Amino acid sequence: MANHKSALKRHRQSIKRNLRNNMVRTRIKNVVKEVRSAVEANDTELAATALRKATSVLDKAATKKVIHARAAARRISRLSAAVNKMA
């Protein structure tokens, strides 16, 4: 365990950031699942609204550097392709 005051503070901060980032990643997984399930169910309206929500969540995560910007773009692109293929 760290002995310096600054190292202890950095450790506390990293724990907080880790919890926050995990919450964001969980949110990403859930919204992506919503889109995928709507596509499988062939529900066009639900898929479109879920895609909008997923795009927003992925872009926010990329902006906050929780996931890489290109990773977010790739996931949005693949989800959009799946929804467009359905329509």
From Swiss-Prot:
Q: Which family does it belong to?
A: Belongs to the bacterial ribosomal protein bS20 family.
- State its role: Binds directly to 16S ribosomal RNA.
Entry protein name: Small ribosomal subunit protein bS20
Q: What is the lineage of its organism?
A: Bacteria, Pseudomonadati, Thermodesulfobacteriota, Desulfovibrionia, Desulfovibrionales
* Keyword Nucleotidyltransferase (UniProt): no
Its GO biological process annotations read: translation
Per the record, its GO cellular-component terms are: cytosol; small ribosomal subunit
Query: Where is there biased composition of kind Basic residues?
Result: 1-19
Q: What keywords tag this UniProt record?
A: Ribonucleoprotein, Ribosomal protein, RNA-binding, rRNA-binding
Instruction: Quote the SUPFAM superfamilies the UniProt record gives.
Output: Ribosomal protein S20 (SSF46992)
Question: Is the keyword Protease assigned to this protein?
Answer: no
Q: Which GO terms describe its molecular function?
A: small ribosomal subunit rRNA binding; structural constituent of ribosome
Annotated region (Disordered) at 1-22
Pfam families hit by this protein: Ribosomal_S20p
Species whose genome carries this gene: Maridesulfovibrio salexigens (strain ATCC 14822 / DSM 2638 / NCIMB 8403 / VKM B-1763) (Desulfovibrio salexigens)
